[in-house]
Swiss-Prot record:
Together with its co-chaperonin GroES, plays an essential role in assisting protein folding. The GroEL-GroES system forms a nano-cage that allows encapsulation of the non-native substrate proteins and provides a physical environment optimized to promote and accelerate protein folding. The keyword Cytoplasm applies. CDD domains: GroEL. This is Chaperonin GroEL. GO terms for cellular component: cytoplasm. The gene is groEL. It is an enzyme of class 5 (isomerase).
Length: 544
């Protein structure tokens, strides 16, 4: 086991604070409408230019082990805030730096760090409650666009395209961000349910131009096993043929003579059918088949529930207004499912999201909700160069997370104003303990730091602006983008309450742990001797 370097007291705390400051100073320059870029060197390809706090934080590793521990703890603040709210990482970092800097003064002066932390926690709890009270719902498309614009560093185009996407697919819909092919941002919307399985044979194509199989007013047969014997299918096919309507078959697989017969019937025009594989695998496949059944008003034919394919009737089949099947995707538009049943299914999946432990499971469940409740929108980010594309994509993703957070918990005045106004909740907060009261004072001062940094990045004088904002009331604040004072919400400078709340909670949590640290242990790097020179090769014998 390698030897350890153990350090105590003020000396080690100072090193930790140095690490915090190095990371926070790199991140804080990106805050606000006039925040600057950070350029990050990459081992492969061109440099990465970003204004995203968490991206900058993730790149920082320091040589000194103790400084690096401080930096990594603040990195955790940014990452956690990003995981919960998807934005606000720079605000969280600035708050953490401020709480640590203020708190260390009190610790050095001999106050009890544990009581300071308790005071900080009580102050944060009061602020969070106040933020919830002052938050207003974010319902209109205009407000959603404003939140998106602010998060994307005042890029109004980004805000507008996100608002349009949310309008098209609903607030629960899936919105993804991809690289575009042109210079402009584009929005593609897939209405209805889409899953990533295409036709099993190109002979099913009936629209040669689009290379898709389009079915109008079709029946939908859902089966959870393989179909290889055409005899099992014949009774259903005959009933569908009598009804003179097309049929989509979704099964684990369709192969052999069953597939061949369907193709021949299709080519001859006897019966318009298309076969596709069921989406997903294992239990997820069963769940998705059930989703499709509820969406189309059909039943999954499964031997597990005593249903067999040869006894299936038209009542067991789902129906839809139109279904389009491409090489890799199938889209069901306007299923005939019962709205109440669809809502109940969505509520059931939401319940599963609450209890899911892995991010992957949550993401897949969220996709299922979106496919049932709304649709899928794809924002294609356009840019002139690859470097610009990456930077723009970062901002669009941030803005998307921010708008989702705004819809969830409402919005508050942006530009650091909400935190200043929430301080009213601390005026009458007395803990009955001098050291805990000092913890409350630490938070009182720290909540000014985001506004101070926004003003500093815009080239203003932070103290002057903070005093002027404190003289006002309600949503009165400073718009660093235009240099004006006024009602922040009317000027469209909004922050999601969830982002502000998460930033404050995570910053205080990690900063509190730092203040109560009195010993740090790091490995002493071993000085490995250099590799010895390789011996020379022996001389070759004389050649004949």
């Amino acid at each position: 086991m390698a030897a350890k370097d153990v350090q105590f007291g003020n000396e080690v705390r100072q090193k930790m604070v140095n690490g915090v400051n190095i990371l926070a100073n790199a991140v804080r320059v990106t805050l606000g409408p006039k925040g600057r870029n950070v350029v990050v060197d990459r081992a492969f390809g061109g440099p990465h230019i970003t204004k995203d706090g968490v991206t900058v934080a993730k790149e920082i590793e320091l040589k000194d082990k103790f400084e690096n521990m401080g930096a990594q703890m603040v990195k955790e603040v940014a990452s956690k805030t990003n995981d919960v709210a998807g934005d606000g990482t720079t605000t969280a970092t600035v708050l953490a730096q401020s709480i640590v800097a203020e708190g260390m003064k009190y610790v050095t002066a001999g106050m009890n760090p544990t009581d300071l932390k308790r005071g900080i926690d009580k102050a944060v709890a009061a602020l969070v409650e106040e933020l919830k009270n002052i938050a207003k719902p974010c319902d209109t498309s205009k407000e959603i666009a404003q939140v998106g614009s602010i998060s994307a560093n005042s890029d109004e185009q980004v805000g507008a395209i996100i608002a349009e996407a949310m309008e098209k697919v609903g607030k629960e819909g899936v919105i993804t961000v991809e690289d575009g092919k042109s210079l402009e941002n584009e929005l593609d919307v897939v209405e209805g349910m889409q899953f990533d399985r295409g036709y099993l044979s190109p002979y099913f194509i009936n629209d040669a131009e689009k290379q898709i199989a389009g079915l109008d007013n079709p029946f939908v047969l859902l089966f959870d096993k393989k179909i290889s014997n055409i005899r099992d299918l014949l009774p259903v096919l005959e009933q569908v043929a009598k009804a003179s309507r097309p049929l989509l078959i979704i099964a684990e697989d369709v192969e052999g003579e069953a597939l061949a017969t369907l193709v021949v019937n299709n080519i001859r025009g006897i019966l318009k059918t298309v076969a596709v594989k069921a989406p997903g695998f294992g239990d997820r496949r069963k769940a998705m088949l059930q989703d499709i059944a509820i969406l189309t008003g059909g039943t999954v034919i499964s031997e597990e529930v005593g249903l067999s394919l040869e006894k299936a009737t038209l009542d067991d089949l789902g129906q839809a207004k139109r279904i389009e099947i491409g090489k890799e995707n199938t889209t069901i538009i306007d299923g005939f499912g019962d709205a109440a049943q669809i809502e109940a299914r969505v509520a059931e999946i939401r319940q599963q999201i609450e209890t899911a432990t892995s991010d992957y499971d949550k993401e897949k469940l969220q996709e299922r909700v979106a496919k049932l409740a709304g649709g899928v929108a794809v924002i294609k980010v356009g840019a002139a160069t690859e470097v610009e594309m990456k930077e723009k994509k970062d901002r669009v993703e941030d803005a998307l997370h921010a708008t989702r957070a705004a819809v969830e918990e409402g919005v508050v005045a942006g530009g650091g104003v909400a935190l200043l106004r929430a301080r009213a909740a601390l005026e009458n907060l007395h803990t009955g303990n001098a050291d805990q009261d000092a913890g409350v004072q630490i938070v009182l001062r720290a909540v000014e730091s985001p506004l101070r940094q926004i003003v500093a990045n815009a080239g203003g004088e932070p103290s002057v602006v903070v005093n002027k904002v404190l003289e006002g009331k309600g949503n009165y604040g400073y718009n660093a983008g235009s240099g004006e004072y006024g009602d922040m919400i009317e000027m469209g400078v909004l922050d999601p309450a969830k982002v502000t709340r998460s930033a404050l909670q995570h910053a205080a949590s990690i900063a509190g742990l730092m203040l109560t640290t009195d010993c740090m242990i790091a490995e002493i790097p071993e000085d490995k001797p250099a590799m010895p020179d390789m011996g020379g090769m022996g001389g070759m014998g004389g050649m004949m």
